[in-house]
Amino acid sequence: MELGALLDHLVGKALATMLGGIPIVKPSPTELIPQQPDCVEVGTCRVIGGVRPQNFDVVYRPDGVRFAFDSKTLNDCKSVQKNYQNMINDLGTEATTVHTRFPYALVAFLVAVPHPCLSSPQKEALTGTLERLSSRASPLNSNHKAEAISLVVWDPESGEVDRDWPENTSCLRIERFSQQIQTAYLARYKGLPPHA
């Protein structure tokens, strides 16, 4: 299984558990509503937002988009150097696309970069920019921000996550990702159907 697909599966499973053990289904890439009334969709899922149609990897949309997730993997040094700024632009556009039409929706991103491909000053620049794009606290805040972003720096030899970067105080730490999503989701949707 490719890294991005593995991350999507894990996020979808955690989201379905958080929502009370609802089913996980594979979406139809052309359908604008889910195949079941209350499910988490994992796979290419089309969302029609305020800027353009956008594909996401994990979506929960019982009554419109409530949660949209996209994983971004830059798998080699050439790709990181060449594409990381474009990826940052994509994140802002994807968040804007969802939040313009669904301001209460949660948008989350997980960015995975191999450790050997992330060096100074690019490492600090990428981290700082992702921190600024993260932590959208209210539906009234900037549409271009995501409610949660995680930066995962990993060792391609061992498969282990770098425990030293991002720094321990960063909102981008993978250990904080699920809690940020749960906190934001409960603040916006607690007590509302379909899982009241």
In which residue ranges do the predicted regions lie?
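Active-site beta-strand-loop-beta-strand hairpin of nuclease catalytic cores
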Residues: 51-69
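Acidic-basic catalytic patches of nuclease active cores, encompassing PD-(D/E)XK
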Residues: 1-43
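N-terminal cationic-hydrophobic initiation segments that often serve targeting/anchoring roles
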Residues: 16, 99-100, 141
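N-terminal low-complexity, intrinsically disordered segments
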Residues: 39-54
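Non-catalytic C-terminal interaction segments of nucleic acid-processing enzymes
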Residues: 119-196
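Structural beta-sheet core signal
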Residues: 68, 108-111, 151
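Short, internal active-site loops enriched in acidic
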Residues: 29-38, 113-118, 156-158
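Catalytic cores of nucleic-acid endonucleases
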Residues: 73-123
